């Protein structure tokens, strides 16, 4: 771990995974003091992700302390392709990236992180994907003295965090009638939601992934969701996160049998459904699974005092039933002044890739599904 001091603050660069593992308690305390935390920056999620996907020697986690107390952190890693880049830990299986700043010392912490990042990125471009518009990383971008660029990234759909029945009650006309009918169908069948305790998480993850595979039978499933490393990551991370309240697992049972399972993640103002699995027999019974799941996650968000219910990445048409607001994540590129040509090159690479994707999707509509599946693969530095 390398370190330097500036303005009474100690800035360190953690490159050792064991040292990162030892940060759990103070990292989680900082996560709770942050104004804009997402579940994907929890220590449980990042530590587990690195075990499954990280590469030795690539860890680059910036830490800021005042009098020994952690007040800022940026969980990054080094990749070499297509060029040297500092990118977020968490890869493509994480929907959002942010830095962590102690809310009471955010100004000092972000300034120190900026200075630390300037040193850590002496020969690299910083490429921060999936940054929410209100993220703390926006403060870092705003104060960055070197070259920078803001690009658009994934679109997410969001709703206010309130019980779904309340939202449906305000809907008028045929749309409201259809949604109320779908909810009554679930209730009439007697499907019951059961929260899974921490010690039940390993078995519940196995059930969720089996149901997820079954629901995609005959269609193009994200292959990463069927791999052992992904299952192992969820078992490790979600077990801890259920314990500290940043995750919830819910099984839906019909006559005692699990017919659907859902994993939701939450922290700060945000709750979102991350992954689910459902028995195809529910479709045969005309059950609207997305409506059933959304009602449960919305209730969790409301009960937990959250203000935002995120439908996470993707603007699929079925999400529009509820009248969500689209929120576009951003991609922030940063570099030292002398590395501006490299930043512009990276900017061009991203633009060319996006144009190619749009061209293929326009000329070959069937490729849209393939692109969405492949875009979800955990390719580091994507």
Q: At which residue positions do the language-model features occur?
A:
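Aromatic (often tryptophan-rich) hydrophobic motifs at membrane interfaces
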Residues: 65, 94, 102, 107-118, ...
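A conserved beta-strand-loop-helix scaffold within acyl/acetyltransferase catalytic domains
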Residues: 11-86, 131-154, 162, 169-285
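Short amphipathic alpha-helical segments
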Residues: 9, 95-97, 191
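Active-site/acyl-donor-binding loops of N-acyltransferases
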Residues: 2-9, 13, 138-166, 170, ...
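Acyl-group handling in specialized metabolite and lipid biosynthesis
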Residues: 98-103, 194
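Short, flexible turn/loop "capping" segments at secondary-structure junctions
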Residues: 4-6, 89-93, 185-188
